[in-house]
Regions:
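Active-site-adjacent segment of 2-oxoglutarate/Fe(II) JmjC oxygenases
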Residues: 2-19, 147, 154-169
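Basic K/R-rich, polyanion-interacting modules in nucleoproteins and related proteins
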Residues: 37-86
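Short beta-strand elements
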Residues: 30-31, 36-44, 150-165
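Single conserved hydrophobic/aromatic residue that forms the stacking wall/gate
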Residues: 167, 172-177
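Aromatic-rich carbohydrate-binding modules that target alpha-glucans
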Residues: 78-124, 137-163
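Long, internal scaffold/assembly segments composed of regular secondary structure
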Residues: 1-43
Length: 177
């Protein structure tokens, strides 16, 4: 009926003293710490692999603080997706870290020298889910298929809205188990 997508990718940086999940390196370049994530690769040609994600959400957390909302620091996080340039469209980062909006803030640039898509983003310490979406030229709709793949086993969260001519009648969130 519609593409299932794939599980979100995960990363976590809770301290500048150690590398977190999916973190290659942390270094300080005044005025921010920089987090270099491990290079990501396309997942559209492989087989489905389950990963317990949070369906695109993020959580502000830090290991060296008592109140993450006020004490967590901001880091510049470097995302890289190694692949050939995808013709006839653009690549975007997606998830709650970008309010699920595909715009210039989430659009990745292609580096022909390193042969990868790259994006640096200022984020607060924590755990993040994200995915890469391909948006064809002339469209505003992101597709998971060309980069993340579509797998029927993917566990998704769906919002169902019952609407009449005048107003919203009901709303329900359903988890695909």
């Amino acid at each position: 009926i519609f593409p299932a997508g794939n599980e979100y990718r995960r990363m976590e940086f809770l301290s500048n003293k150690y590398n977190g999940m999916h973190v290659e390196n942390i270094s300080f370049h005044n005025p921010y710490y920089n987090v270099e994530l491990m290079t990501d690769y396309r997942r559209d040609k492989g087989t489905y692999q389950y990963d317990q994600d949070q369906d695109g959400r993020f959580f502000i957390r830090c290991s060296d603080c008592n109140d993450p909302d006020t004490e967590a620091d901001y880091y510049i996080v470097h995302f890289t997706l190694a692949c050939d340039p995808l013709p006839d469209g653009s690549v975007y980062l997606n998830g709650e870290l970008f309010n699920n909006v595909l715009d210039e803030k989430s659009k990745m640039g292609y580096n022909f020298e390193t042969k990868q898509y790259e994006k640096a983003v200022l984020l607060k310490q924590g755990s993040y889910n994200y995915q890469y979406l391909f948006v064809p030229t002339g469209s505003s709709v992101g597709q998971t298929g060309p980069i993340e793949g579509n797998y029927y086993q993917t566990q998704n969260e769906y919002s169902i809205y019952a609407v009449s001519y005048t107003h919203l009648r009901a709303h329900e969130t359903v988890l695909d188990l």
